[in-house]
Regions:
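Helicase motor core with emphasis on the C-terminal RecA-like subdomain
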Residues: 1-281, 285-286
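Accessory DNA-binding and partner-docking regions appended to nucleic-acid-acting proteins
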Residues: 211-217, 221-383, 388-503
Length: 503
């Protein structure tokens, strides 16, 4: 399962190894199941006798699963933190939850900062450095926090929300106690957030129609066996989020349909840091004439100018590459400020493989298979939290470590406190008539945007409040009913929509 949608480009590493004829490879991971280990070994031609497992069990980590209703979570969080010493991490699912929980803890007088992918990279770096130095004691974070974090004295990790899988759970608690001193890993668990983690999965599965559109785009835009891609525009057109779009492209690569060649920036704009004459003064002859021509055939809006590459080729015979080199040279000499955007990736295309009538369906089946496996992993996580035998032992066995003690003595189950997870309150549905009305309104709205057919998945994503390119582009989130079933599991919403809309 490694690579899919997390680091899809990882899936290409075995091919790179073969292409570059690399004789030896070393794969390192802390959280691979037996099946994943075999899969990785097979892809990299690693023999079974060359697989080494050093053990997963960590006796200094105390694992506790607490069944806590949503309304009681904040109080339990404070109580749990007050019982700890030193610094720690509180993991949440959503960006807004990170800020909400951090604000709550700050009001209680704790040294805390939120951290999530919505922050600018400079701010994330500053928060991380403050935590590493001890200036900040607690980080409330989404899974965006953790990669590359190696702070030895993290004394506690608390999951305020459900993790996404046993793999995620183990990676996140694995950041505690790296100095081998006792550390506590606490999960405040109920089933209220189950729909949220499941919806992340459902929202990333492309529809067959979207995959088919991508294939048709390659067929129509391919010239001389080359295809140029601007990721955001194709993502919008196909209604496929950018991360699964990247996964789709990787799968097309692995099947030999496309092969990456190079990339370039489609749009350039520049502004002078001095006068135009002072920019031209250091140059003579043809070089000066060439630069003057670039400036002449640049469309300026106030201070920024965009070179017209077609006009430059027509009037001066220069190709795009020479213009870019000249602009980059001027920027290096601090004579202009140059900005680039719209990175364009260029692929070679195997038209024979691209024309396979089963290509789109096979790719869609791949994504659906991954979706089903991800949902099963979430269910496995819930079952793990509800176990009545040692958590440490079962966690180690999950990762193929058969040598962990049967009863660790430092988990909530070994202390006789096994749990049964429940919903904090009954799920409240909008009535069927209301669902029919808001979906009818969605269909009417999209018909004005030249979208005559609204799929079942589009309706379900609308009701559950999932953001997809189609909604952002057509202002769908402003419609009444968007997210009206956001607290309900996606599969249940799908069944309801099929019945109400007679699909």
């Amino acid at each position: 399962e490694w690579g899919h949608n997390f680091r899809p480009d990882y899936l290409k590493l075995p091919n790179y190894r073969k292409e570059l004829n690399i004789p030896l490879v070393l794969l390192l991971t802390a959280t691979a199941t037996k099946k994943v280990k075999k899969d990785m070994a097979a892809k990299f031609s690693i023999l079974p006798e060359h697989i080494v497992q050093t053990g997963f069990y960590r006796q200094n980590l105390d694992l506790s699963i607490l069944a806590v209703p949503t309304k009681a979570k904040n109080q339990q969080l404070i109580e749990s933190i007050n019982e700890q010493s030193g610094c720690g991490i509180v993991y949440v699912t959503l960006q807004q939850s990170a800020e909400y929980v951090a604000n709550f803890l700050s009001q209680q007088g704790l040294s805390v900062q939120p951290y999530h992918a919505g922050f600018m990279s400079e701010k994330r770096q500053e928060i991380q450095e403050d935590f590493m130095s001890g200036k900040v004691q607690i980080i409330v974070a989404t899974i965006a926090f953790g990669m590359g974090i190696d702070k030895a004295n993290i004394r506690f990790v608390i999951h305020y929300d459900l993790p996404k899988s046993i793999e995620n759970y183990s990676q996140e608690i694995g950041r505690a106690g790296r100095d081998s001193l006792p550390s506590n890993c606490i999960t405040l668990a109920n089933l209220d957030g189950l729909n949220t983690v499941e919806n992340f999965v459902f929202g990333d599965t492309p529809e067959l129609s979207g995959i088919d559109l991508v294939i048709k785009n390659i067929q129509q835009e391919c010239q001389n066996h080359k295809w140029e891609l601007q990721g955001l525009s194709l993502s919008n057109a196909s209604n496929i989020r950018q991360l699964p779009m990247r996964t789709l492209l990787v799968q097309l690569e692995l099947q030999g349909v496309i092969k990456p060649l190079f990339s370039y920036f489609a749009d350039f704009k520049y502004k002078f840091t001095t006068t135009k004459d002072e920019v031209l003064d250091p140059f003579e002859g043809e070089r000066k004439e060439f630069l003057a021509t670039i400036f002449k055939y640049s469309g300026f809006k106030k201070v920024w100018g965009e070179p017209d590459f077609d006009a430059l080729f027509q009037h001066y015979g220069c190709d795009r590459g020479r213009v870019i080199v000249a602009l980059e040279y001027l920027q290096e000499k601090q004579l202009i400020t140059l900005e680039t955007k719209k990175i364009t990736e260029v692929y070679s295309v195997n038209k024979t493989l691209l024309s396979s009538p089963t290509l789109a369906r096979s790719l869609h089946e791949y994504f659906v298979d991954k979706e089903e496996k991800e949902i099963k992993r979430i269910a496995t996580l819930v079952r793990f939290f509800e176990l009545d035998t040692c958590l440490s032992h079962n966690l180690s066995r999950y990762f193929d470590d058969q040598n962990a003690p049967v009863n660790c003595g430092h988990c909530s189950v070994c202390r006789g406190k096994e749990v049964k997870l429940n919903y904090s309150q009954d799920v409240i549905w909008p009535d069927d008539i209301r669902i029919f009305e808001v979906l009818t309104s969605l269909i009417e709205h999209m018909s004005t945007k030249n979208k005559s057919v609204i799929s079942l998945e589009t309706m379900c994503r609308f009701l559950t409040g999932l953001t997809v390119p189609l909604f952002s582009r057509n202002k769908v989130k402003q419609l009444a009913g968007f997210g009206s079933c956001e607290n309900i599991r996606y599969q249940e919403v799908r069944e309801k929509v099929i019945r109400i809309m007679n699909l």
